[in-house]
Amino acid sequence: MAQSEDMTRCISLCMSCYQTCLGTAMNHCLETGGKHVEPKHFRLMMACAEMCRTAAHFMLINTPHHRHTCGECAEICTECAADCERVGGMDECVSACRSCAQSCGAMAA
């Protein structure tokens, strides 16, 4: 069964968010320190990255369970976007998380 355009776009947004969150955490937050490495914030970024990767994986294998992973991904991405905005200096992460959350929310519906 072929993927819909919406699913293909969602997979792309999930992978982009995965790359952005993980890359920002490892190359920006760890180097910047301070509130960027607060355990709650850093764990949230790691959870967000991994959930995005997992949601993309579930869509790629075309399991109907992707609705569950996409729902959780939307929730975590929304929380991560808000926390990255709170910490500051992470506009790329905020944008990637919001785009992914919106797309995953639609896939979960």
Which sequence ranges carry the predicted segments?
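Amphipathic alpha-helical hairpins
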Residues: M1-A109
